[in-house]
Every structure is written in C-alpha cells, then in structure tokens.
C-alpha cells in the first residue's frame, strides 16, 4: 500500500468540501482554499490519520469520530475460519476480475505502477488477498473508520482524491451501505483517469446487515446502469440463488424463533445451498442472485434507457 506521506507528496489529497488541495502543517490537516470552512477548522485526526470528510454532508459526525478515535460504529467480527469456509465457498469472481483489471491496466500504464483505489476498504475484501500482496500495485484505500489497511478516513460521497488520479477502483460490498449510490458512482468516475477501470460487487438478495448502515440493493441490470458511464467488460452474479436461499432460511428462522443463534444454526444446516450456486443455470441464478458484479471501463458515451433493456441477462 502507498504510505500516507506519498499521497501528500504526490498532491493527491483534496478537500472533500471544495476540492482545493489539502495541506499538512505541524500535524494539522487543512484545506488550502481561502474561503473554505476546513481552512479555518482543521480536519480531525483519529488513530493518527486525517478524517478528510465534509461532515456537513455525511452520515459521519466529527465529534463522535474523535470520541471513538476513528473506530468502526459497526462490530466487524467474522465467523471463524472453518465455519466461514463451509458457509462461503471461495469467492473466485473478485480475484478473476481484479486480475483482469490489472492485466488491462498494465498494458496501458507502460511500466508505470497501476494506482488502484479501494473504496470502503476497512477490511481486505473476499478474494482480494493477492491484490494486497502484489508489490507492483500502488494501493490506496479509505473507509468511514480508521483501519490498519487504509491511509485515511473518508466518505465515498465526496472522495478526497484529485480528479483522474487513479487507474482502477474497487468497491466491494459497499454500495448497499451508502445513502446515495449514484453520487458514489459518479465520484468513482471522477477519480478514475479516462479509460480507467472499476470493479464493483454489491448485494442483490441479501438481508439487512450492518444494521442502521444498510440502505439499498441492486438487480444485475440496476447495478450495470449505476455505472452507465462505463463500457461493460464483464458482469453477472458473484453468489447465486443457492446463497440467497441460505441467507433467507437463516433470517426466516431468526424472525420465527426470535433468536439469532437459532438462525445461525439453520444456516449451518443448510450450508450446502451456497455450494449449489455453481450448478445453477446462470441466467436464472442472476435473477435471484445473492450479489452481483460489474467490471467496466470509464467512457465518454453513457448507455441509455433502451441500452439497459437490451442488456438484461436474466432468464425471463
Ligand atoms: C460489508 S463491509 C465491506 C468491507 C470491505 N470492502 C470488504 O469487502 O471486506 C462495508 C464497508 O463499507 C463501508 N462504508 C459504509 N459507508 C461508506 C461510505 N459512505 N464511504 C466509504 N465506505 C463506506 C463500511 O464502513 C464497511 O467497511
Ligand atoms: Zn476546502
């Protein structure tokens, strides 16, 4: 991963309020714009990193963020290794698409290291281990909380990075948690250089997770249209109808018995449903997928309403 100092030295950081450069002086982070509120009041520093957030237009609250020193408001425990492997067959979609993204970027950056941004990257996403271990990629990551795998705290609704500053963007399991996905998608487009590549994967038929911080779902077509100013390289389901059904059993049992542990037990009993995803017809499965993905290249020519009707790749 790039060091925070490298982002400063390369003038990549901008004010999320007004877009002026961000300056660090005597440990304080301020906007260089003469009339900006963040020129007077510095950005908070939490867990040693700046929170480059326009708090007036964010679900984040500056005082609360300072009080918890940038810690996540949501508990981030994952089930233990063996249990996780049983319930979640390895995600092969993300590594395949990210490898393709890097291969395409490398032919274009001609020797320059590709710069890839991870939006909502507080944890290393499923199947992204190889990307994080790749010493030839300049990785930037941020999230709404401070984490050892991010360089700063930020909000995807106003990404504090300069226009056209990255070659690739990864946004995995994040767009359901933002209030305005179209705004976040247009920020992704803004920070990508012309011809830059996005990989997004997002839930479709998944129950609420992360409690109060869960807002939206996407069909495969809706997800593709969110990235309307991108040319499609590939898209489809990440986890299919079997996984969606296992989640439904879990949450049905929770609701019926008023017990989360009993829901988890039911999920374990039906673990095999997730493993059926690979056997299912892809067209029917995408209509009932647990999550969908889109890999695409930024373009000047957006698709329109009739293009998205032609795009439909389900089974009806
Ligand atoms: C389900 S987690 C996925 C995390 C990681 N991408 C992964 O796949 O392991 C959703 C993430 O979105 C982040 N998030 C929520 N709202 C956000 C926002 N407005 N801007 C950036 N990240 C956000 C959350 O903090 C959380 O880390
Ligand atoms: Zn500013």
Named regions from a protein language model:
Residues 171-174, 200:
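A short beta-strand submotif of the Rossmann-like class I SAM-dependent methyltransferase core
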Residues 172, 179, 188:
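Ligand/cofactor pocket segment of small-molecule handling proteins
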Residues 38, 158, 176, 206, ...:
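Active-site micro-motifs of SAM-dependent methyltransferase domains
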Residues 178-179, 192-194:
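Helix-to-beta-strand junctions that scaffold the AdoMet/dcAdoMet cofactor pocket
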Residues 160-162, 179, 219:
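GHKL-family ATP-binding catalytic core of two-component histidine kinases
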Residues 126-127, 179, 208:
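Glycine/Thr-rich phosphate-binding loops of Rossmann-like dinucleotide-binding domains
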Residues 182-187, 197-316:
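S-adenosyl-L-methionine-dependent methyltransferase catalytic module, highlighting the catalytic core
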Residues 1-164, 168-171, 289-292, 299-316:
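Conserved N-terminal segment of class I S-adenosyl-L-methionine
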């Amino acid at each position: 991963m790039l060091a925070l100092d490298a982002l400063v030295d390369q003038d990549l950081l901008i004010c999320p309020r007004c877009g002026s450069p961000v300056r660090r002086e005597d440990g304080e982070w301020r906007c260089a714009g003469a009339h900006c509120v963040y020129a007077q009041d510095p950005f908070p520093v939490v867990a040693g990193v700046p929170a480059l957030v326009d708090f007036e237009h964010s679900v984040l609250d500056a005082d609360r963020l300072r009080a918890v020193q940038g810690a996540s408001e949501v508990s981030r425990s994952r089930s233990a290794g063996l249990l996780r492997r049983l319930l979640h067959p390895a995600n092969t979609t993300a590594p395949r698409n990210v490898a393709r993204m890097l291969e395409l970027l490398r032919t274009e950056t001609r020797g320059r290291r590709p710069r890839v941004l991870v939006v909502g990257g507080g944890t290393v996403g499923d199947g992204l281990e190889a990307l994080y271990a790749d010493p030839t990629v300049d990785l930037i990551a941020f999230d709404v909380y401070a984490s050892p795998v991010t360089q700063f705290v930020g909000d995807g609704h106003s990404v504090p990075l300069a226009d056209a500053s990255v070659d690739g963007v990864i946004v995995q399991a994040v767009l359901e948690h933002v209030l305005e996905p179209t705004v976040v998608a247009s920020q992704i487009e803004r920070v990508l250089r012309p011809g830059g590549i996005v990989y997004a994967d997002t839930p479709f038929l998944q129950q609420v997770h992360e409690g109060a911080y869960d807002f939206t779902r996407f069909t495969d077509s809706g997800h593709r249209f969110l990235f309307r100013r991108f040319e499609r390289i590939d898209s489809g389901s990440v986890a299919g109808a079997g996984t969606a059904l296992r989640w439904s059993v879990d949450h049905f049992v929770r609701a019926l018995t008023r017990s989360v542990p009993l829901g988890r037990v039911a999920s374990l009993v039906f673990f095999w449903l997730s493993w059926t995803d690979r056997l299912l017809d892809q067209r029917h499965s995408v209509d009932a997928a647990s999550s969908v993905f889109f890999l695409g290249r930024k373009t000047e020519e957006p698709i329109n309403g009739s293009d998205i009707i032609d795009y439909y790749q389900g089974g009806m």
